[in-house]
Amino acid sequence: VTAGLLSGPMVWLVLFFVAPVLYVASYSLGAIELFPTDTGVISLEGWRHFLGGGSIYLGLFWKSVRMSLTVSVVVTLLAYPIGYFLALCVRKFRYVLLVIIVPFLTSFLLRVLAWKVMLGDRGVVNSALVSLHVLPADQPIEWLLYSQFTVMLVLAYVWIPFVALPIFVSLNNLDRSLLEAASDLGASRLRTFLRVTLPLSAPGLVAAFVFVFIPTIGEFVTPLLVGGTSGYMYGNALQDLFTRGLDWQSGSVLAMFLLIVVAGLMALFGRY
């Protein structure tokens, strides 16, 4: 009976996950002949080109890692007080969490495009600064849009409410008697937080960090809309190789490398 119940999900998993991954892995080795330029001969040339010195794609990967790390750290630091406030300070008003999340149920593209309107040369921010005579009308702040800063700002905005959830759950499950015991033993609020609350909520922090880092390292929609050439990321290169360049072997190499990195991170942080 158990085997019968598992057969459906297993077939689904093999057809729509394992098989596509194996196909992409085979393509990265040149084993599949799909286009006239494909040889169908197994070769590591694509991997050597990607991992070799001076590879623009490898450099782009590390650029994306730096940006994703920055976003993940900032988002985790900003989301922790939100989760702390909701879990330990306002237990009777947890509907605040719903109020925070509801605006983020709107279209992702609309929210990103809203930032584009706000940060443009004639957007809300520049117009306000011009109205306050902080900036001359003909000299807007150009780096507010189409830059690495813009990409990281928008990504942080998008992910903060969702990262607050695992932190909230972690803090909400804390044994309150431990906090009371620390207080009874004379520990200050700061010492109680540093010695009790923070260590016990560490799994939630790690989960929140990974929850942001893994998706953002391969992000391509946000850089495409608000990043320009400065905010171009690894995911954009991967997309361009498959769509514009039609270089599916190189695109498969980039995709498999990202999959290996993500799988490694999941294995590393899985114990949390």
Set out the residue ranges of the language-model regions:
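Transmembrane alpha-helices
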Residues: 7-18, 102, 157, 163-176, ...
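Cytoplasmic-entry segments and transmembrane alpha-helices of multi-pass inner-membrane transporters
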Residues: 2-6, 82-118, 179-180, 193-194, ...
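C-terminal transmembrane helix and the adjacent membrane-cytosol boundary/short C-terminal tail
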Residues: 168-179, 183, 252-272
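Transmembrane alpha-helix signature in integral membrane proteins
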Residues: 55-86
